[in-house]
């Protein structure tokens, strides 16, 4: 049970996006971000590994990390923000943690994440 006023909850539910794919920490995603340059707007892709995810309704956010010219870059996106145009899951990662902050200390091949394979059918 949420402790929010029903009116606040109704307004927040109207703001929620419905076209967000299911993704988890460890997944490699491409986030299309709306960038305003002067009077024109364009989409900029930010591709990286999801290292954290916070599910809080309208306040949901996720952190994406990538290596750009040898420097680690992390960006926190608000899941339901109008700035985020599209989220595309490129690769599913198989990890045993919810927060992958340990990847900050690793570099090169040590920072690789195993790919999650589809479940085998028994029988």
UniProtKB/Swiss-Prot annotation:
Pfam families: Ribosomal_L19 (PF01245). One of its GO terms (molecular function) is structural constituent of ribosome. Signal peptide: none annotated. Keywords: Ribonucleoprotein, Ribosomal protein. One of its GO terms (cellular component) is cytosolic large ribosomal subunit. One of its GO terms (biological process) is translation. NCBIfam families: rplS_bact (TIGR01024). This protein is located at the 30S-50S ribosomal subunit interface and may play a role in the structure and function of the aminoacyl-tRNA binding site. PANTHER family: LARGE RIBOSOMAL SUBUNIT PROTEIN BL19M, RIBOSOMAL PROTEIN L19. Belongs to the bacterial ribosomal protein bL19 family. This is Large ribosomal subunit protein bL19. The gene is rplS.
């Amino acid at each position: 049970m949420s402790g929010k006023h029903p009116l606040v909850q109704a307004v927040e539910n109207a703001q929620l996006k419905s076209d967000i794919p299911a993704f988890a920490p460890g997944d490699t995603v491409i986030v299309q971000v709306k960038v305003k340059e002067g009077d024109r707007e364009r989409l900029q892709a930010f591709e990286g590994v999801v290292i954290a995810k916070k599910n809080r309704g309208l306040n949901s956010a996720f952190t994406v990390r990538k290596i750009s010219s040898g420097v680690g870059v992390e960006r926190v996106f608000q899941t339901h923000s109008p700035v985020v145009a599209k989220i595309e899951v490129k690769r599913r990662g198989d990890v045993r943690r919810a927060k992958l902050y340990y990847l900050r200390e690793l570099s090169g091949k040590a920072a690789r994440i195993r790919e999650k394979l589809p479940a085998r059918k028994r029988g």
